[in-house]
Amino acid sequence: RNLKPIASYLLAGSIILLMITKGYYLINGIESPARWLYLGLFSFQTSDIARLSLIIFLAYYLDEIKARIKNLYDGFLPPVTAIGILMAFIVIQPDFSTAFMVGLIGILLLFISGARIFHILTSFFAGLLISFPVIYFSPYRWARIRSFFNPDIKSDGYQAYQAELSMSNGGWFGSGLGNSTEKNHLLPTPHTDFIFSIIGEELGFLLGTLPLLLVFLFIFFRGIKIAKRCTDPFGIFLAMGICINIVLYAFVNAAVATGLFPVTGLPMPLISYGGSGMFINMVMIGILLNISQAKRSINNSKTWSSLSFG
């Protein structure tokens, strides 16, 4: 409830942070992707903050307008515009994968809220049309798409090939903790983008990757159950947005590691190394737990324990 009054300010603040991040890199002539904002000894990825802010804003907005979401101009168009603006500022960092995920999460929330299918499909295909030149005229993005359909293991397809090789090395039961060969300068970014491959190599399918995916499915279905029990529409949309976000990121990361998706650079939630991403995901889990205990604490305030959730 404390998030509702500041939802719009959080979204506006996130857009400002994205602008500051890009401006900082341009002013200082830094050629690397403008994804991190540095404050002394600390740094954080501003798109992570934007992702959470958008979920909170959409939950607030959908709660406020309710059935008007079926109207185009005073219902559906404002949140789609907010999603588009946020995606645009993330794309120019450049971080197309995160922008795509932000858009997908937003569209799914609009679908859950009861928006017209025609409006949703129109927005989705419009996004695809805009995305094509963004991908095609970016050499490294187009190389990732091209290598997915025609992999060159010595060039653009090297990462994907090594990730699949790592998974195959693990087999059913893995090579043992710490025994991965791929993480020793063979597979790029094994601690972030391809952590799922290393888990598969060291712990195997039965002890590593399958249990991990089941944990994320548990979080997803638990989040849906929390949303169904919640009596506040804001809490319902917030819980749904959070569990959709977590499970989408998890399964896209796993799909990249197994060769089902092109390389995206998206981390595995709660697993991949990274301060700001880990912090934001923990905040999301905390909000989900808060929504879960709210109804119980009201109905049974004398016996409620902070250790009991759901």
Residue ranges and their predicted role:
Residues 62, 103-119, 181-207, 266-279:
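Interfacial segments of multi-pass membrane proteins
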Residues 30-36, 119-211, 230-235:
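Hydrophobic, glycine- and aromatic-enriched re-entrant/interface helices and adjoining loop segments
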Residues 1-93, 254-269, 273, 277-278, ...:
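Membrane-helix boundary/helix-loop-helix interface segments in multi-pass membrane proteins
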Residues 8-15, 73-91, 96-136:
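Hydrophobic alpha-helical segments of polytopic membrane proteins
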Residues 55, 59-62, 139-142, 217-220, ...:
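Alpha-helical transmembrane segments of polytopic integral membrane proteins
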Residues 226-265, 271:
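Loop-to-helix entry and N-terminal half of a specific, functionally important transmembrane alpha helix
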Residues 10, 50-57, 211-218, 238, ...:
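Residue-level signal for the membrane-embedded core of alpha-helical transmembrane segments
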Residues 139, 213, 220-235, 300-309:
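Membrane-proximal intracellular helices of multi-pass ion channels
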